[in-house]
From Swiss-Prot:
2 of the reaction center chlorophylls (ChlD1 and ChlD2) are entirely coordinated by water. It is found in: Plastid, Chloroplast thylakoid membrane. Keywords: Acetylation, Calcium, Chlorophyll, Chloroplast, Chromophore, Electron transport, Herbicide resistance, Iron, Magnesium, Manganese, Membrane, Metal-binding, Oxidoreductase, Phosphoprotein, Photosynthesis, Photosystem II, Plastid, Thylakoid, Transmembrane, Transmembrane helix, Transport. [CaMn4O5] cluster binds at residues 170, 189, 332-333, 342, 344. The gene is psbA. The modification Phosphothreonine is found at residue 2. Chlorophyll a PD1 binds at residue 198. The record marks 190 as: Stabilizes free radical intermediate. Residues 345-353 form a propeptide. One of its GO terms (molecular function) is oxygen evolving activity. This is Photosystem II protein D1. The record marks 344-345 as: Cleavage.
Length: 353
């Protein structure tokens, strides 16, 4: 009888825990994805802050030339970064217990791998938590689908690209100038500006910003006034009201006359689907582009495409970009390579006696 009561009590304890985890009445929804999300994101954030402040220099290129990234080792907010794991480690899983000492782990850039892997797991769980909360509330799942775009982009630069290049040392550093360095080196080695998927991503981000500004300004400019001229239009509304706060017909009429009739949406669902889909699809394509360039399927190469009747090259912008790429590649890892890989890969002319 005692065992039966204990079992029933423990079952109810587990049941109460499950109810609390999945309750939509909590101020912040936890969910089963949150059970994994919270510790992983807390770990990634804590280690990032500590390492950004105090981590010793990291031998990123594996050539015994450590690079400083933390504030206590001479950096500021702009130049500071979490330096990627050493090329000597490559793609090996490198937790603290795999190193001979904590000093060795820090020297080889162990914190970068720890932060990145916990962060990716955490943001993936955040996406799952968005779906889970939508499901509990009877909503459709598109919020999580939209969030998949930045998750895919993060996975591309922190995981897929290092896998394709063979080392976590090629991942994006976790800092401002480190991000710019990653972008410059990526352009030098993969010609990303000439990749159509990157072009689609640029159109998605800039187009999304434009459409967001247009939509917000149109809505704000076509509010249905519920107040007199002597008080703010904002005073005529309450949060969560069922009635529409703006006149979409007026906004449609304005924009249709500003551009032309069919450039404007007169259906709210179509409009908001477009506003969500445009940047999301663009960022999906960018993530896909990074993931293909990770395996060296690079941007278009139009170098020396135009020649005159004598066979002399007439430079185009493609050749100017190529020269810039070579210059950037020369400066990258300057002590690890004697000259750019593009030049090193050219077959030497045969010398006959």
């Amino acid at each position: 009888m005692t065992a039966s009561l204990e079992r029933r009590e423990s079952a109810s304890l587990w049941g109460r825990f499950c109810d609390w985890i999945t309750s939509t009445e909590n101020r912040l929804y936890i969910g089963w994805f949150g059970v994994l999300m919270i510790p992983t994101l807390l770990t990634a954030t804590s280690v990032f802050i500590i390492a950004f402040i105090a981590a010793p220099p990291v031998d990123i290129d594996g050539i015994r030339e450590p690079v400083s990234g933390s504030l206590l080792y001479g950096n500021n907010i702009i130049s500071g970064a979490i330096i990627p794991t050493s090329a000597a480690i490559g793609l090996h899983f490198y937790p603290i217990w795999e190193a001979a000492s904590v000093d060795e782990w820090l020297y080889n850039g162990g914190p970068y791998e720890l932060i990145v892997l916990h962060f990716l797991l955490g943001v993936a769980c955040y996406m799952g938590r968005e779906w889970e909360l939508s499901f509990r509330l009877g909503m459709r799942p598109w919020i999580a689908v939209a969030y998949s775009a930045p998750v895919a982009a993060a996975a591309a630069v922190f995981l897929i690209y290092p896998i394709g290049q063979g080392s976590f040392s090629d991942g994006m550093p976790l800092g401002i100038s480190g991000t710019f360095n990653f972008m410059i080196v990526f352009q030098a080695e993969h010609n990303i500006l000439m990749h159509p998927f990157h072009m689609l991503g640029v159109a998605g981000v800039f187009g999304g910003s434009l459409f967001s500004a247009m939509h917000g300004s149109l809505v704000t400019s076509s509010l249905i006034r519920e107040t007199t001229e002597n008080e703010s239009a904002n005073a005529g509304y309450k949060f969560g009201q069922e009635e529409e706060t703006y006149n979409i017909v007026a906004a449609h009429g304005y924009f249709g006359r500003l551009i032309f009739q069919y450039a404007s949406f007169n259906n709210s669902r179509s409009l908001h689907f477009f506003l969500a889909a445009w940047p999301v699809v663009g960022i999906w394509f960018t993530a896909l582009g990074i993931s293909t360039m990770a395996f060296n399927l690079n941007g278009f190469n139009f170098n020396q495409s135009v020649v005159d009747s004598q066979g002399r090259v007439i430079n185009t912008w493609a050749d100017i970009i190529n020269r810039a790429n070579l210059g950037m590649e020369v400066m990258h890892e300057r002590n690890a390579h004697n000259f750019p890989l593009d030049l090193a890969s050219v077959e030497a002319p045969s010398v006959k006696a």
